[in-house]
């Protein structure tokens, strides 16, 4: 096997130290387990048995995090539904977010070690790694499994925490026009789209769905909220129980700006 472009020894070592297993690293790096180990030996990097065997290194995390509903948990779940990934083979989940402050906050809420996957020429978005069999099981109970993007269901969120969950969804896959008149959420899941539309309509917001088809032939759903008065109303609902920092700053600013006009 030959290395993938950009995979220097330093990048491989950083990836290993982030907690990724040899099995996870192989397709990214383009090397076999043995070749990756040789890189570690070459640079005097100590290896534990779990990594040698291909299992992810254990990190600190509150394994009961998704068992108890709170506004913070609902927000994190909304982010995971949109920006998360469940590893099919390993007991690992990943959060990807351009705003690294959000990843730091997720790690804080989940009492998790702040371990990021290595970035490279083809992987530039910061990704938080959490290794936990229990958390993976709890997410499955909520209907969230690997390869979820086209089939993930809208979780059964208690009414009390619904606004916080929707805030997480908007922070993950939402877009807000700079002028503050238009917002949409993009999803490949018909259930997410239909249920989100129902929620917006139940909040008496002017909303609609548009559907397009991707080059791969998959449906892409966009759920819209439009109007000078609609977005401030949405902002009032979803930020009511937010802390001072658990949201994407520019999205809140854009949605809320019409309050002051």
Predicted regions and their residues:
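Internal intein/HINT superfamily modules and their associated LAGLIDADG
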Residues: 1-261
């Amino acid at each position: 096997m030959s290395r993938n472009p950009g995979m220097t020894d330093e990048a491989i070592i950083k990836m290993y130290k982030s907690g990724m297993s040899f099995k996870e690293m192989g397709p990214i790096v383009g090397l076999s387990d043995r070749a990756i180990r040789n890189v570690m030996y070459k640079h005097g990097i100590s290896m534990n048995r779990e990594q040698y065997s291909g299992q992810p290194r254990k990190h600190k995390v509150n394994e009961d995090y998704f068992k108890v509903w709170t506004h913070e948990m609902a927000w994190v779940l909304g982010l995971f539904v949109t920006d998360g990934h469940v590893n099919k083979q390993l007991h690992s989940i990943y959060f990807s977010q351009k705003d690294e402050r959000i990843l730091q906050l997720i790690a804080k809420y989940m009492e998790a070690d702040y371990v990021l996957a290595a970035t490279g020429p083809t992987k530039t978005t910061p990704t938080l790694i959490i290794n936990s069999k229990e958390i993976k099981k709890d997410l499955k109970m909520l209907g969230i499994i690997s390869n979820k993007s086209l089939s993930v269901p809208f979780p059964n969120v208690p009414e009390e925490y619904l606004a916080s969950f929707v805030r997480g969804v908007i922070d993950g896959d939402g877009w807000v026009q700079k002028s503050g008149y238009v917002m949409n959420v993009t999803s490949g899941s018909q259930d997410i789209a239909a249920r989100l539309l129902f929620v917006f309509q139940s909040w008496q917001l002017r909303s609609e769905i548009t559907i397009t088809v991707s080059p791969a032939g998959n449906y892409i759903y966009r759920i819209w909220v439009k109007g000078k008065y609609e977005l401030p109303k949405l902002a009032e609902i979803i930020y009511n129980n937010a802390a001072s920092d658990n949201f994407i700053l520019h999205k809140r600013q854009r949605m809320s700006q019409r309050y002051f006009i």
